[in-house]
Amino acid sequence: MDGFTDSQAPPAYEEVKWLADTLVAFMGIGWLINYGAMIRHSYQGRTYCMGIIPLCNNIGWELVYTLVHPSSNRVELAVFAAGVTLNVIIMFAATRSAKTEWQHSPLVANHTPLIFLGGTFVCFAGHVALAAEIGPALAYSWGAVICQLVLSIGGVCQLLQRNTTRGTSVTLWLSRFLGSCCTVGFAFLRWRYWPEAFAWLAGPLVLWSLATFVLADITYGVCLYLISQTETSSTKRSKLK
């Protein structure tokens, strides 16, 4: 069953298709806000907001399902096209700020463009291989799961390693988290009203991935708040001196 098309959807799903499409649109809006905010933060703070591996993985996945296996859903395809465009801009911004961010590692700082290009190619090839192995429809969903987990867990690690809110904000976190939650809602509708094709979405590995994503992103929000409070307290103490 093609995971992109609704042409063979049962009547039960057709009744809620408007809601599914709305969730896809809101997912796109959330992520586009996130990408736009990342670009702004990158140029204001001279740093990048998304880790190297998650960024390469996202671009590789988006390229596959924009160019190699494009969705027949126009809303979804438009979201992919806009996402990959903004991600490339984010990559340029990250390359621009690499010398500042990687002062402790000249090998990375001086070869960031090559690292990004190589990383994106490897991830792109991996997603193409996954589509060839299990089919584009399933690979699309599992590729998205991989991207989300790498991004969520990587984001927590990056925040804890930096121990600063530089390069991040509540807007960045919420737009990403809520955008991904809309994707979860879309998947729920397909599982609930189209079980013939999407019963696998209630499988153990999918549910583990969902729980891990939610736990990681909530952890990110809590850590962001705690670090922000520490920075605020430090600023107040500095002003009193």
Curated annotation (Swiss-Prot):
Pathway: Secondary metabolite biosynthesis. Its main location: membrane. It comes from the Eukaryota. One of its GO terms (cellular component) is membrane. It is a multi-pass membrane protein. Belongs to the paxB family. This is Terpene cyclase terB. It comes from Tolypocladium album (Soil fungus). The gene is terB.
